[in-house]
Amino acid sequence: MPGHKGRGPLGCEELDITEIAGADELYEAEGIIAQSEANATQLFGTARTYYSTEGSSQCIRAMLHLALQMQPAKAGRPVLLAARNAHKALLYAAALLDFDIQWLWPAPDAAGALCTCHVEPEALASALDELAAEGRTPFGVYLTSPDYLGFVQDIAGLSAVCHAHGLPLLVDNAHGAYLHFLKEGSRHPIQLGADLCCDSAHKTLPVLTGGAYLHLGPSVQADEAAVRNALALFGSTSPSYLILQSLDAANAVLADSFREKLDICRWRLGMLCRELDALRPGLALPLTGAHREPLKLTLDAAALGLSGQQLAQALRERGVECEYADPRYVVLMPSAESSAAEFACLQTALHAICDEAPAADVSVAADDPAAFAALAGALEAQPRRFTIREAVLAPQEMIPAAEAVGRICAAPAV
């Protein structure tokens, strides 16, 4: 193996190797992979950093498995306290590992944003106290930061609450691998107090799709074998060496020119946002502030009298492909590798759309906080019929959403 023998139409086949002598083995690393991971550990300033070739999804399952192993033995089903905007990888992990989830719901004024669930430290402390009063101590707290719309949690404050309750904080930082390399200092979750954290290197760093990191903070006592076994449990026995080489090559970039290129990208993005603010106030969400990340352009299509999907289609027709669109928002993700020409293309497209869009007072329907609060309360009040594992693995059928009232959702709907 491999069957292509280093030859083929793509041109990269000679680099696509397997666990041959000298190439090391990802889940039993002792040679060049272990050394490369040690280099990444030093670059990110973590206690330990491990590679994944199957994205943050593999890392999420592994870190939840580790957190379950770390909890003291106790009666009852394990429960995780998690913000409701979690990626579906968390739900699949709950099905595989068979734990329950107690949700932290977003504030009512976030009703129109499926991807956002801001959690205040006081709210987290209250939720933990309520669980304790019920005799249910979670094995950890799970947050997504940054989220898809570019909002970040108060990781420092929230980690302090977790640690005061003797719990680990797990952070899905899939969109924030670059946060350690900001010129003003690291805003990476591990430096802010998270215990376990995943980064999708491929989302914001010069790494092939699938390349990711599992980071451990200094408080995590799991030994080397336990961490590698956790990753192996959820990974292919044939990890991609192309992706591993990409992760290794990124170390040199991160140690050399990345911070400067990242700063240039942020400057270009800031200039564009200021232009958009002048054209259509409220179109671009802020890039600065304690609860915003600086490398995600989130557009509120309501400022143009459009839906998010309409704005995304208008951009697509002008040669710009968006990362995400929903009924209200559009998300674009530049990186340190984005060129001046690409920013110019985006600028031209947005100027044209602003010129053609309806008056700014035409907007999508406003969110109804009261209706959202009622919905969240009704969902929480429903008796549980199945565990997540039972629902995901049960026989299923596809039906129209209008006919789903009173039925049990068998898989993530987003």
Segments the model singles out, each with a brief description of its role:
Residues 20-49:
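Active-site-flanking structural segment that lines cofactor/substrate pockets
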Residues 10, 16, 35, 46, ...:
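Conserved PLP-enzyme active-site core in the AAT-like
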Residues 21, 274-278, 285, 299-414:
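Non-catalytic terminal extensions of PLP-dependent enzymes
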